[in-house]
């Protein structure tokens, strides 16, 4: 009876030990992941600085270093999303509805019934004849 209880106990404990081992090995510690990300960012920053130094002959290397460190920090703060970015219109839809876009009114002001463009509407409608031609001296 003692041997049977030991095997029963071993069959219960072995999967738990295997699960704990997998958890410890496969799941990274948050401190390790942040240090890895920082080291990757530093490596990218050094590569960018070396590339910028080779391409440009600027005496102000400190200014280049500070701008690149800001760029590196922003790259590390990038948020990972699950899909592509949806393009947004420049004018929001709500604002577009509130704006007065009467194309018919502007066409009526610019063109007569025959499609001729009317220029210089300071004098009113009597300045033009029925065909859209300007009247002079009448």
Swiss-Prot record:
Gene Ontology annotations for the cellular component aspect, listed alphabetically: extracellular region
Pfam families: Sulfakinin
Keywords, ordered alphabetically: Amidation, Cleavage on pair of basic residues, Hormone, Neuropeptide, Secreted, Signal, Sulfation
Location of this chain's protein in the cell: Secreted
Positions of post-translational Sulfotyrosine modification: 114, 131
GO MF annotation: an example: hormone activity
InterPro entries with a match to the protein in the record: Gastrin/cholecystokinin_CS (IPR013152), Sulfakinin (IPR013259)
Record bears the keyword Signal: yes
Signal peptide (residue range): 1-33
UniProt function note: Drosulfakinin-0 (DSK 0) plays diverse biological roles including regulating gut muscle contraction in adults but not in larvae.
Family: Belongs to the gastrin/cholecystokinin family.
Protein name per its UniProtKB record: Drosulfakinins
Organism of derivation: Drosophila teissieri (Fruit fly)
Higher taxonomy: Eukaryota, Metazoa, Ecdysozoa, Arthropoda, Hexapoda
Name of the encoding gene: Dsk
């Amino acid at each position: 009876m003692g041997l049977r209880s030991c095997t029963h106990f071993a069959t219960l404990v072995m999967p738990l030990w295997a699960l704990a081992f997998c958890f410890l090995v496969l799941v990274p510690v948050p401190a390790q992941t942040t240090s890895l990300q920082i080291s990757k960012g530093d490596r990218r920053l050094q590569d960018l600085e070396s590339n910028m130094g080779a391409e440009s002959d600027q005496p102000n290397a400190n200014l280049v270093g500070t701008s690149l460190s800001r760029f590196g920090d922003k790259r590390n703060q990038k948020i990972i999303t699950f899909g592509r970015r949806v393009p947004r219109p420049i004018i929001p839809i709500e604002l577009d509805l509130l704006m007065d876009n009467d194309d018919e009114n502007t066409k009526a002001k610019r063109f007569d019934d025959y499609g001729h463009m009317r220029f210089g509407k300071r004098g009113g409608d009597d300045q033009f004849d029925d065909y859209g031609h300007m009247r002079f001296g009448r």
